[in-house]
Amino acid sequence: MSLDISQFPVLAQANTPNELRQLPQALLPQVADELREFLLKSVGISSGHFASGLGTVELTVALHYVYNTPFDRLIWDVGHQAYPHKILTGRRDKMHTIRQKDGLHPFPWREESEYDTFSVGHSGTSISAALAMAIAAEKEQAGRKVVAVIGDGAMTGGMVFEAMNHAGDLHNDMLVVLNDNEMSISENVGALNNHLAQLMSGRFYTTLREGGKKVLKGMPVIKEMAKRTEEHLKGMVVPGTLFEELGFNYIGPIDGHDVDALVETMRNMRNLKGPQVLHIMTKKGRGYEPAEKDPIGWHAVPKFDPSLFKKPTTKPGLPTFSQVFGKWLCDIAEQDEKVLAITPAMREGSGMVEFSQRFPKQYFDAAIAEQHAVTLSAGFACEGFKPVVAIYSTFLQRAYDQLIHDVALQKLPVLFAIDRGGIVGADGPTHQGAFDLSFMRCIPNMVIMAPSDENECRQMLYTGYCYDAGPSAVRYPRGCATGATQVEAMTALPIGKGVIKRVGKRIAILNFGTLLASALTAAESLDATVVDMRFVKPLDVDLVKEMAQTHEVLVTVEENAIMGGAGAGVLEQLQKLRMPKAVLQIGLPDEFIKHGSPEEVTHDLQLDAEGILAQINAYLAQ
């Protein structure tokens, strides 16, 4: 259900940036207030990312007011903070559908709107893309401006500094807005720095600055003295040395919730030459007290009533696989102080909060730097420690070279706890864990495990901890576990051995992972054998051979891309054994999986019990 726009009289006049730019600047504070209220109520209806968007309302209004979007390019990093952008760019009436099946995409998405100039979802990509667009703009000579908006969290990623180093060297015209919400806005930032930013971005100062550079060009000693004097003046209130050293002109920090100051500063900066950084200070969750006090807890929210000032209470249910991992990690750390846990800024999502509090000296948050996190773990393994890398499937993609070159090649005993394997649902194609089995299976020295339930997950984690001949991975899905009883005692599983769960006739279903329950349900109608394969690599070749010899048809089931996945491994072994056999591979198709609830996506892909049965019957009928 969409909101009644008549409750937002000024925002109603700004359904697009063109309409926004027709309004007098004096109305912009009211636009921002109504936009924040609209966002608050809209996310309450739809669920979704919340605190980040509340913090970028004034910034979004100012950007679309000053810049001629979509002609001017605006790139959002990650995109959690882009809900206000969607509201102001013609998608206001569809905001209640965001992250839902057939609804608005959770992140800026090129296919959705001309205002979304670059599709995003992973961190640290905006400046690289913006630099390319700035280079293209210079070649076109059409007067196009380019702006990248990036948060302070994303600034921890190495790709960001690679891009800034390149941009500073090329010196193309572009603006990087650094949205810094790590600290509250002090009076100093809100007043003095707003004035200083407008002064330093103004025409008189920049003309003087550029003219001085030309005059002093042939006098390097004097030029260096002048540069140091300027840095001393700015350094009294401005922490911009790093950006200046990278070749950027730095302005700020300024109050990111003062829309008039943002507009005036951006107007001044719009025509500056070379790469620019505008540093703004914002508050995550701005305007909604619970989110201001707990921005992490309110980062993403279910449907809720904003008037209650709390998230809806949920009945205690099954633990999530992330919680199963977190408990195992604490249990094993109690036994072994050499266990070290590493995560790339995913403490909460990976279930590591308790561990980080109880074992702070054994916990390492590498920030949004997946490559560094994996090689850090390799170094720990070299020194005899037991590193455990907790990482989402989609983010492990970013450290693929490190996984191969720094871990597997050296046969280092690093345990990868891979969360969000398979369908994640509402976050869509940028976050589905569709490829990990495929891209890990081809790496020598890897052991890859796919648990069917929480108890098997716990035992597999212990198996990986005990395995010292090389790296191992335990891959589990997002969401609640299956309800299986967890055995507290930990036992290492025999490497590369599966378990027969049901004995049937004619058809054998070889299951990899948590679709086992659905496979068993489908098997009842087919009187099929069901095998919990457990290990994707090394594959239980003896069991595959036995199933091929005693059944007419083999069916592989996995929540991973069919291409190169676990089922492909079964086919490779049958080929190697010279055993021609009818094999149906069930898994994720050769496409990027769209957003929707996990249940909806699973049903649409025919990966629930009903769908598995239908796929097998259709195959048998051919």
Swiss-Prot record:
Binds 1 Mg(2+) ion per subunit. SMART domains: Transket_pyr. It comes from the Bacteria. One of its GO terms (molecular function) is magnesium ion binding. Its cofactor is Mg(2+); thiamine diphosphate. Mg(2+) binds at D152, N181. Keywords: Isoprene biosynthesis, Magnesium, Metal-binding, Thiamine biosynthesis, Thiamine pyrophosphate, Transferase. This is 1-deoxy-D-xylulose-5-phosphate synthase. It catalyses: D-glyceraldehyde 3-phosphate + pyruvate + H(+) = 1-deoxy-D-xylulose 5-phosphate + CO2. Thiamine diphosphate binds at H80, G121, H122, S123, G153, A154, N181, Y288, E370. Homodimer. GO terms for biological process: 1-deoxy-D-xylulose 5-phosphate biosynthetic process; isopentenyl diphosphate biosynthetic process, methylerythritol 4-phosphate pathway; terpenoid biosynthetic process; thiamine biosynthetic process. The keyword Metal-binding applies. GO terms for cellular component: cytosol. Catalyzes the acyloin condensation reaction between C atoms 2 and 3 of pyruvate and glyceraldehyde 3-phosphate to yield 1-deoxy-D-xylulose-5-phosphate (DXP). Transmembrane segments: none annotated. Belongs to the transketolase family. DXPS subfamily. Its EC number is 2.2.1.7. Pathway: Metabolic intermediate biosynthesis; 1-deoxy-D-xylulose 5-phosphate biosynthesis; 1-deoxy-D-xylulose 5-phosphate from D-glyceraldehyde 3-phosphate and pyruvate: step 1/1. Pfam families: DXP_synthase_N (PF13292), Transket_pyr (PF02779), Transketolase_C (PF02780). PROSITE patterns: TRANSKETOLASE_1 (PS00801), TRANSKETOLASE_2 (PS00802). It is an enzyme of class 2 (transferase).
